[in-house]
Amino acid sequence: MRLFILTSSKFTIPRALLCQKVLDIIELGLSSAQIHFYIVGDNLPDSLLTLEQTNDAVTIIKEVAAEKLIKEVTNAAIIHFGADLKGSDQFAHYFIPLSDPSCIPGLSMIHKWSLTKAFKKYLKKSVATYTINEWATRFLKNKYKRYTTKIQEAYLPIHRLPIYEWVALADAKNSLTDGANYFLAFQPLDAFVDMLKEFSIFKKWQQTNMVLVFIFENEKEVAQAESLLVGYKFKDAILINSISNMELKWIAATYAILFNNICFDKTSLIEMAIEYDIPLLFNNDENQNESLPTAWQQAGEQFSFEEKGGLSNHFKLYYKDEVYRQGRARMGKDWLTDLYAEKKNTALVKIPLALKTN
């Protein structure tokens, strides 16, 4: 079977995350001599380039060439994360949603409608839509009730992340924060100023060069956050980036990551951070739109980001107490190890070994 894996998407998915999932799929399928993998795309990370160089069963191919090849073959299937390949309608399509239009803030009504329409089209067209964990399964089945029979959880753990030696991590910090240690924060725009106030308290306490790096969902939010930053006393210690520009090295090099009001689209980032021994902090305030599922509550530390002094105290704690920070990271690692062991022993679909061409 020729398995075409598309590396583009209509939806907002960090490039590093999407390409890591492509790597995970192929690594889990290399044991089969019946599958030849075609990675469709360009400007791919070194991890996928190396995978092709070291495996005869892997070929990187540009989209135009893939469109030509798909017309010439008879035994093929397509895996995608929200994309199309011209000329492939006669073959089985498998949709792996890593995000959903409702997870993207700030969309215009027309843009959100267009993305939702595309999402439903992929659901309808797919032979099966595979989710990567029970959080995504619950969310998508509740939202797209018409397609619940197509939506099912698959076994697709992180297989192998890039290994960064301390020199590479130091380079990442130099590029991002001029060498300063930093916290990484996924914070909604409407809570941005509140976190700045808490970070100010921490900076006044500690007199440190620690930096707070915010990751927003799109360039529009980045621009709005930058306008709110005008006049902030510790402006030089704040960095603002879009998730589309985020690199895996940023995760691997951070002190800790703060997640506020997250959707299932951040679950892969959670797993990656844990693999890199990074402790996680979750907002468990009762006013959140979606609470952290019970099965994921041991992945990190939970407290209310809205409680006065809560964030500033945790900034201080993770900055000053390395033993505590490492202990929290180990707790996350233990949780993820147990989760993967449990999933491996259940009757989940194994991607790509269980896929068929029609």
Predicted region positions:
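Acidic donor-binding loop of glycosyltransferase active sites
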Residues: 76, 127, 251-265, 278
